[in-house]
Amino acid sequence: MDEVQYDMYTTLATLYDTQDLTMPSSNAQRIGAIAETRFITECLERDFEPHTPTTPMPWDYIVHCPAGDLKVQIKSTSVRDRSAYTVNSSCGASVKGHMSDDIDVVGIYISPLQEWWMIPRYLIKSKTIKLYPENPSKSKYKQYQNNWSVYYE
């Protein structure tokens, strides 16, 4: 590559804003980024098509799958409190808000267990979701543990 062409590419590269290429700044943001990346991988391995919205929406992905086009909100947690993993069901930075009724599925990734819970949105009534991976009698969402059937129904 000649020097003129190299300078042109270097100039073009500096015009792009690389702000979005920075690493997540907190551990929670890293866990969220890992969960979203794993979700995309899981979808592609199942021949689903995950699409991110181009404008801010209450869902993270629209997933084209055998059940149709589903709006999916991804949540993640790594903190265990006694026998439960707890996730806030609100969207955004505020825990006062509520989860949008436009969402079809809430995908929750428990990072230490590397496990997914795919819960239909209409079943979530409270601002916190408690998941009990080892205690089926306490968990009202146990049937959605590592269960992707909502994408096939």
Regions found by a protein language model. Name each.
Residues 2-4, 8-21, 124-153:
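Charged phosphate-binding loop/patch that engages nucleotide di/tri-phosphates or the phosphate backbone
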Residues 8-51:
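Acidic-basic catalytic patches of nuclease active cores, encompassing PD-(D/E)XK
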Residues 26-28, 32, 46, 97-98, ...:
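Residue-level recognition of single "structural anchor" positions
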Residues 43, 61-63, 68-78:
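Conserved catalytic cores of phosphodiester-cleaving nucleases, focusing on short active-site segments
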Residues 54-56:
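Short, glycine-/polar-rich solvent-exposed loops and beta-turns at beta-strand/coil boundaries
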Residues 70, 115-117, 127:
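Short beta-strand segments
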Residues 75-117, 121:
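Catalytic cores of nucleic-acid endonucleases
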